[in-house]
Swiss-Prot record:
The gene is sfsA. It comes from Pyrobaculum neutrophilum (strain DSM 2338 / JCM 9278 / NBRC 100436 / V24Sta) (Thermoproteus neutrophilus). NCBIfam families: sfsA. It comes from the Archaea. InterPro entries: SfsA (IPR005224), SfsA_C (IPR040452), SfsA_N (IPR041465). This is Sugar fermentation stimulation protein homolog.
Amino acid sequence: MAHVCLPLDEPDARGVFKRRLNRFVGVAEIGGADELVHIHDPGRLAELLYPGSVIWARRKKTGKTRYYLTAVELADELVFVDSAKHNKIASWLIESGVLLPGYRVERHEPAYGKGRFDLLLRGPKGEKALVEVKGVTLEVGGRALFPDAPTTRGARHMEELARAAADGFEAHVVFLVLRKKAAVFSPNWEMDRRFAEALARAYKSGVYVHAVKLETSRWCLKYVEKLPIDLQL
């Protein structure tokens, strides 16, 4: 598995980011013209998307934006930022046996309570496991941090996982760490204390917490290692 990559949709344009218009739309210079780029990741991405940063995007066939942001190119790494692919990545890790060996993906976006989780798994003994997947693109001093912007929805997901565990389900949260220099994962207490507290409570309630480090190359995603987790303030 260490030498296997998950193929990514290959971008067809390289550009220079100029500014963010709103949560999901930015402007980049591509091919000598200013183009609208769809940004699927709702986070701030402030350390990645700033005037002058180099981006990779693929052409869209429909919609108000002509391009879809795939990755940001830093001096020494590519950072994959297409959050729409997180479930696919987690499914690949599970089906490959790297994460939760012996489990298989039974369903995507299973309903639970008043909402949905990302994956429903079936374990080696027939047990059901609910999984929530989060992508991590913020790294500070070797520490991968989530979230990079306050997320009421993320905190609610942790609370729902804790309830699922209390109801007898096996429950997991998987953090996909997409930064090369990350050596440990932590919740971002400074940015979103509510989420950090909800994650810590979920862990104490029996929710399994995983952090998986991945590296982006042109154009595939490679599993690197499982990172230690520090939930302390």
